[in-house]
């Protein structure tokens, strides 16, 4: 028998993280969730540094992308990214504790537009923008 029980918005990111070994490797933790918004955090580790001894640009991008994906899916439908971009504002260092908060700016039947702020404390270090396509598939328990 198929499970037709829908997951509540705040449970969807938890399920997504449990199925996401890459985000687990990054050490991402979910801090806050509500429909259309998700805040996550992680700490930059030595193995995340590039040849200049700064965090690889993909680290901030990956944190932002995870927050974006989690927030986009809180509407209960599988949502997949179709376009993303990031502005790296400040270099990141080993030991930096980063947060990324994704807020949906506009959502339609099929598309959702998000802004993600990546911060080190109160300092904005990256700004990510993303568009998702919302499928008809429901998140279920």
For the regions a language model picked out, list residue spans one by one.
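Terminal targeting signals and extreme-terminal segments of soluble enzymes
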Residues: 1-141
